[in-house]
């Protein structure tokens, strides 16, 4: 993230000096936003700092919500003229006026595991639908997502692409028993599998495989 300084309104680029403290750029990423702080070791007409996307940061088009000089610092030009402690951003000169950065730091999660099959007793060879719903569209690649059922069977969910739901069919086999079918524990990825959302760059991994309370097959 870069800030350019000019001499007056509509003037030419001007070198300034951050004498102490920090020059703080607050980005609109939801909530209180994220602040990029530039330290006092620069002199020039442009100052820049790095923004690292954090968990739960979101923005449909990243912009700067505020500028401030922190740590009792000052910014002055070569003539000693001091910049306001809370500089205003000129109209049309914000980050989102020049760039279209979309931020999605929200990792996908499991919403529920349900079944569309009727509540009844199933015997050997009968099929039961199992549907897993995610908080956003995800892609399962390379290997399966495994659901351990309380009937003693591990149900594999096959790889799929760009969907917020995935389907699997459980066939009851000999010696399978359950008074009320449910997934035990949390689903797990088979070796080499990845489960990510569908961002164009740097997709977010699903890392919390917890099934929310009241959202298991047996709860419906």
Annotate each PLM feature.
Residues 1-220:
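Non-catalytic beta-sheet/beta-sandwich ligand-binding modules that flank or precede catalytic cores
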């Amino acid at each position: 993230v870069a800030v350019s300084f000019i001499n007056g309104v509509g003037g030419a680029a001007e070198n300034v000096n951050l004498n102490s403290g920090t020059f703080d750029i607050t980005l609109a990423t939801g909530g209180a936003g994220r602040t990029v702080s530039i330290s006092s070791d620069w002199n020039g007409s442009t100052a820049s700092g790095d923004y690292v996307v954090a968990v739960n940061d979101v923005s449909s088009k990243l912009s700067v919500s505020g500028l401030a000089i922190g740590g009792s610092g000052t910014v002055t030009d070569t003539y000693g003229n001091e910049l306001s402690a809370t500089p205003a951003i000129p109209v049309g000169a914000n980050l989102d006026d020049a760039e279209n950065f979309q931020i999605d730091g929200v990792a996908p999660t499991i919403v529920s595991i349900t079944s569309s099959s009727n509540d009844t007793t199933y015997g050997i060879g009968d099929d039961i639908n199992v549907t897993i719903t995610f908080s956003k569209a995800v892609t399962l690649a390379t290997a399966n997502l495994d659901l351990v059922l309380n009937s003693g069977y591990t149900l594999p969910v096959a790889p799929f692409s760009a969907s917020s739901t995935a389907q699997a069919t459980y066939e009851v086999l000999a010696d399978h028993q359950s008074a009320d079918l449910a997934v035990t524990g949390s689903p797990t990825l088979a070796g080499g599998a990845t489960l990510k959302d569908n961002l164009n760059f740097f997709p977010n991994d699903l890392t919390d495989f917890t099934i929310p309370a009241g959202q298991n097959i047996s709860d419906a």
